[in-house]
Each structure stands twice: as structure tokens, then as C-alpha cells.
Curated annotation (Swiss-Prot):
One of its GO terms (cellular component) is plasma membrane. This is Elongation factor 4. It is found in: Cell inner membrane. It comes from Klebsiella pneumoniae subsp. pneumoniae (strain ATCC 700721 / MGH 78578). The lineage of its organism: Bacteria, Pseudomonadati, Pseudomonadota, Gammaproteobacteria, Enterobacterales. Required for accurate and efficient protein synthesis under certain stress conditions. May act as a fidelity factor of the translation reaction, by catalyzing a one-codon backward translocation of tRNAs on improperly translocated ribosomes. Back-translocation proceeds from a post-translocation (POST) complex to a pre-translocation (PRE) complex, thus giving elongation factor G a second chance to translocate the tRNAs correctly. Binds to ribosomes in a GTP-dependent manner. It catalyses: GTP + H2O = GDP + phosphate + H(+).
Length: 599
């Protein structure tokens, strides 16, 4: 027990945590040099392509320290992006300490700060590490001051290393062994194991990543899931050295994987406690707080035959990603699908890509919306996550939109640009503090504006230097309206959007213009209108294609031409009554880009 160290690495995106973990694995001999490749722990193709960590991974390594002792390091890699902060809090729950990795050139960023506070709230020992000291732009002294000033932990003797060149990585390991406390727990008490993560394997069923808090788990034991009371057999268990290695037992304080041949996806939920069936523990371990999705979007399979496969895929994915929420939904335009809740737009993109790649599905996504709180005239309060569920205007007493509290850290020279952006997004400044050359800004901005494209625009106005962390603050009454799109007089539910009354005419006009470019021309005119209630605010027409019926007439009487034109006109009229308009996938995505052109 005293030689076990459980830790994770927290850092902002691109501050080098995956590279540092590669070096740690190499030094401890977890993989032979032949098997070593860059970013070993980012095993998903998607993670490698985008260069970000999405899933938390765990590795168990043996490290022979300078004091002659051999320590078992259980190391859990965590993502750095704001949309995956839930993964981080799950990983931290299994640790006693964390390495706070900060880029010695860039300094502290908002995300580092948020994850660091999460770690401190859980009473973890935070060990600061200054990475990338081999870069010419590195200024470790300034960054150490910044860490002390902004984060408030002592950093003057922070370990300095360069994960890329391998300089100072052994110092990191020595400091880790010295500063991070060993796990607490009673090896003789009844078994209590916390499920940190689980995923679905086609051959083994559900595989769970567990942290043993008390007692010992042995192969072949009967194991009980505390929330459901189901009993399973521990068929296989072991550790990752990044490869799966079988063991006969997992001892108190260790982190490892477990296979119990659970075929039911909901058999072992994340955050649940496992105990021995023979000698069960009295109470479950405190799990994780459930996260509320911030962004909702409808996902529909392109062909309705894929619905079953889509449902299974979502089930398997939600096992692996506990922050994904979904419920069935049907749309008149798109058929049957699911309404899914995500933590942010990046999360939504990643889930959609994983569904398309790993499960081979073709999907249509509707525009993302946030949850609104609506008080009806009969004084009941309902929560609306889709524009089509919004009650009629005359039944709404008050519509409240979610407000996000945004913490931004940025260099002083970009302050003006960022403030302009926040004001444009209907933001209200609540705080501003200067730390050396950095400024910490706090704004309250409507969640709908934040999730749409705020992050991208913040990055572009500040040349990538500003960083953002946001969380839900409260609901606030606001003058929001629903803009409907009518095509040939029929409402298309999948194209509706909720927007602020002041922006509605611009958004409506822009949407109608975009639709006009995307809908292919037919044999008859297609009228595209944007409406608030019964009030039309914008209109555009996709002109018909027409055959020149007068081509065969040479000269002759005008009544002959009139007759032909009249005949054509009647045909078009009849066609318009029965004709229906096919909307291409791009049309549904056009809503995403409304308001992007800085309007």
C-alpha cells in the first residue's frame, strides 16, 4: 500500500500532457522501444487526428526510485478540453494527487485553472510541473509567478522538464513519489471498488475500469453491483501497462480493469460501487455528480432502416461516455431519431464522428439548442430543449434563457477585441483582474451564444492566446422568440430556431437567403418564408425551371402562343399542388452558420 501512487495529469490543451505521459511510460519500461509510438494513450483515431485527448486512459507502471524502493504508479490520463471536464473529474476521483502541467512559454490558461480547482476541491495534492523548457519562448520564472498568483499554489521550486527531449522527466517522477500521498484504505475490510469508466467490447461484454478503495478483488469471486444488486462472476481482471495484462487479484489502492461477462449495457453504470457478494460492504462509495447536458441536438439516421443499429450504437457509446444523454424523438421532416444532450459543440462533433466511424452510420444533425425555462400562463414551469416543443406565443408568460458564467484568461493587448466580442454576444462584465501581463475576465453571457461559436471567435480575435472556461449560472428572463421556416406554406420543424427578438429579423433573413442557395430548383416556384408566430419577417423564392414552349412557333398568330403559355401555366399550377420539395442535408446545417458572419 505505502508504495502505490495514484495520480493524473491536468493541463490545458496542447500543454504537452500526452507527450509527458509517453516519456513516463518509456522511463518505467511499460512498453518496449519497438512498441513505443507518439501519444500511446490517445488510442482512438479521432484523438490522433485532432491531436486532443478525449477519453481518460489508465496505465500501471513500476518505477524504481532513487531511494531504492520500487513504487507502483497508477496513472490516469485526462482530457484538457472544456467539453470533457467531466472525464477529468471522474479520473481525479480515483487519484490522491495530480501533476499540474503548464507550458513554460504560454503560462496558465483558464482550463488548467478550472481542472486545478476541481482537484483542490477533492483535496488532492497538486504538483506543479513546467513543461517545454526547451522552447526559445520559455520563461519559467514568469510562469512560476503566474501559477502562484493565479492558481495560488507554491511554484518557485516547480519541476522543470521538457517532455519532448526527455530532460527532467525523472525529476518529475521523483517529486511525484515524494509529494503525492499513498492511498488510504483497509485491505482486510469488505471489498469496495469504484467504477471510473466502462466501455463495450464485442467479445468480452462490458469492461470496467475500477479503483479498489477497500479490500481485495480476486479472479473468480462473485461480485455484486450495489445499485442494481446484480451478482456477476469476476472472469478476468488485470491492469494496463498500456497493454491489457491479466492478474489474479487487484489489491487495495490499485486501479485496474475487470470483465464480468455483463452483456447488458446498463449492468455496471459509471460511478457505481462493486462489492463482494459473500461479504458485502454496508454502503456504496460516493459516486460522481451527474452532469447536465448544455447543448441539445436531434440526430436522425439518413435511412430509416438504420434506426435499430443507431439505437444500439448510442447505448454502447453512452456506456463509455457517461455525459451523453439521449431520448427518442420523431420529426415530420426527418422521421425517427434521437434527441441527444452534449456538454458542448466539440463533444457533439466528436460523438457524431464516433457514431459515423465506429458504427458505420449516416446521420443528419439538426441545429444545436440550449435548454430554456418557460413559465406558461397557467403558472407551470416547463423546460424546453427543442424549438418544436416551445408552446404557442400566447401561452407563454415568461421565457428564461440559461446564462453561462465565462472565465477568460488573455494577454492584455487583446482585451479590447475580446470585450467587443463579449458585448456583441449580449454579455455583461462582472469582474476583471490583472495578473502581470495577463487579464482575468469574468462575463455572464447567454449559453446559446456561448455554445454556438463563441469559443472559435474568441480564439480568432485573440490569435489563439485567450482561453475559456464556462459553467451554467442561472436562468434569466429574456425576450426570445421562435423563428419558423415555411417552405411552400408548410412549416419544417427541423429548421426552427429560437433567437433573441432584436436579432430575429436578421437571423430570419439570413436563413432564408441561405436556404435559397441550397434548395435545388424545381419545375415550380418554391416560396421560402421565415415567420414569428403568424408574422412573416422574410421571404425568398427559388425560381422555377421552365421549358420554352414557344420555340416551335414561327411568327403566326399571338393567340396560338397565348394558348401554349396558358397550358404550361395550368400544368405548373397542378404540379405545385402535388409536388413536394426534397431538402438536402446542407439545408439543415445552414442554421448552424446563421449569425456567423459577425451579424
Amino acid at each position: 500500500m505505502k508504495n502505490i501512487r495514484n495520480f493524473s495529469i491536468i493541463a490545458h490543451i496542447d500543454h504537452g500532457k500526452s507527450t509527458l505521459s509517453d516519456r513516463i511510460i518509456q522511463i518505467c519500461g511499460g512498453l518496449s522501444d519497438r512498441e513505443m509510438e507518439a501519444q500511446v494513450l490517445d488510442s482512438m483515431d479521432l484523438e490522433r487526428e485532432r491531436g486532443i485527448t478525449i477519453k481518460a486512459q489508465s496505465v500501471t507502471l513500476d518505477y524504481k526510485a532513487s531511494d531504492g524502493e520500487t513504487y507502483q504508479l497508477n496513472f490516469i490520463d485526462t482530457p484538457g478540453h472544456v467539453d470533457f471536464s467531466y472525464e477529468v473529474s471522474r479520473s481525479l476521483a480515483a487519484c490522491e494527487g495530480a501533476l499540474l502541467v503548464v507550458d513554460a512559454g504560454q503560462g496558465v490558461e483558464a482550463q488548467t485553472l478550472a481542472n486545478c480547482y476541481t482537484a483542490m476541491e477533492m483535496d488532492l495534492e497538486v504538483v506543479p510541473v513546467l513543461n517545454k523548457i526547451d522552447l526559445p519562448a520559455a520563461d519559467p520564472e514568469r510562469v512560476a509567478d503566474e501559477i502562484e498568483d493565479i492558481v495560488g499554489i507554491d511554484a518557485h521550486d516547480a519541476v522543470r522538464c521538457s517532455a519532448k527531449t526527455g530532460v527532467g522527466v525523472t525529476d518529475v517522477l521523483e517529486r511525484l513519489v515524494r509529494d503525492i500521498p499513498p492511498p488510504e484504505g483497509d485491505p482486510d475490510a469488505p471489498l469496495q471498488a469504484l467504477i471510473i469508466d466502462s466501455w463495450f467490447d464485442n467479445y468480452l461484454g462490458v469492461v470496467s475500469l475500477v479503483r479498489i478503495k477497500n479490500g481485495t478483488m480476486r479472479k473468480g469471486d462473485k461480485i455484486k453491483v450495489m445499485s442494481t444488486g446484480q451478482v456477476y462472476n469476476a472472469d478476468r481482471l488485470g491492469i494496463f501497462t498500456p497493454k491489457q495484462v491479466d492478474r489474479t487479484e487487484l489489491k487495495c489502492g490499485e486501479v485496474g480493469w475487470l470483465v464480468c461477462a455483463i452483456k447488458d449495457i446498463l449492468g455496471a453504470p459509471v460511478g457505481d460501487t462493486l462489492t463482494a457478494a459473500r461479504n458485502p460492504a454496508d454502503k456504496a462509495l460516493p459516486g460522481f455528480k451527474k452532469v447536465k447536458p448544455q447543448v441539445y441536438a436531434g440526430l436522425f439516421p439518413v435511412s430509416s432502416d438504420d434506426y435499430e443499429a443507431f439505437r444500439d450504437a448510442l447505448g454502447k457509446l453512452s456506456l463509455n461516455d457517461a455525459s451523453l444523454f439521449y431520448e427518442p424523438e420523431s420529426s415530420t421532416a426527418l422521421g425517427f431519431g434521437f434527441r441527444c444532450g452534449f456538454l458542448g459543440l466539440l463533444h457533439m462533433e466528436i460523438i457524431q464522428e464516433r457514431l459515423e466511424r465506429e458504427y458505420d452510420l449516416d446521420l443528419i444533425t439538426t441545429a444545436p439548442t440550449v435548454v430554456y425555462e418557460v413559465e406558461t400562463t397557467s403558472k407551470e414551469v416547463i423546460y424546453v430543449d427543442s424549438p418544436s416543443k416551445l408552446p404557442p406565443l400566447n401561452n407563454i408568460q415568461e421565457l428564461r434563457e440559461p446564462i453561462a458564467e465565462c472565465h477568460m484568461l488573455l494577454p492584455q493587448e487583446f482585451l479590447g477585441n475580446v470585450i467587443t466580442l463579449c458585448v456583441e454576444k449580449r454579455g455583461v462584465q462582472t469582474n476583471m483582474v490583472y495578473h502581470g501581463k495577463q487579464v482575468a475576465l469574468t462575463y455572464e453571457i447567454p449559453m446559446a451564444e456561448v455554445v454556438l461559436d463563441f469559443f472559435d471567435r474568441l480564439k480568432s480575435t485573440s490569435r489563439g492566446y485567450a482561453s475559456l472556461d464556462y459553467n451554467f449560472k442561472r436562468f434569466q428572463a429574456s425576450n426570445m422568440v421562435r423563428v419558423d421556416v415555411l417552405i411552400n406554406g408548410e412549416r419544417v420543424d427541423a429548421l426552427a430556431l429560437i433567437t433573441h427578438n432584436d436579432n430575429a429579423p436578421y437571423r430570419g433573413r439570413e436563413l432564408v437567403e441561405k436556404m435559397k442557395d441550397l434548395i435545388p430548383r424545381q419545375q415550380f416556384d418554391i416560396a421560402i418564408q421565415a415567420a414569428i408566430g403568424n408574422h412573416i419577417i422574410a421571404r425568398s423564392t427559388v425560381k422555377q425551371l421552365r421549358k420554352n414552349v414557344l420555340a416551335k412557333c414561327y411568327g403566326g398568330d399571338v393567340s396560338r402562343k397565348k394558348k401554349l403559355l396558358q397550358k404550361q401555366k395550368e400544368g405548373k399550377k397542378r404540379m405545385k399542388q402535388v409536388g413536394n420539395v426534397e431538402l438536402p442535408q446542407e439545408a439543415f446545417l445552414a442554421i448552424l452558420h446563421v449569425g456567423k458572419d459577425g451579424k
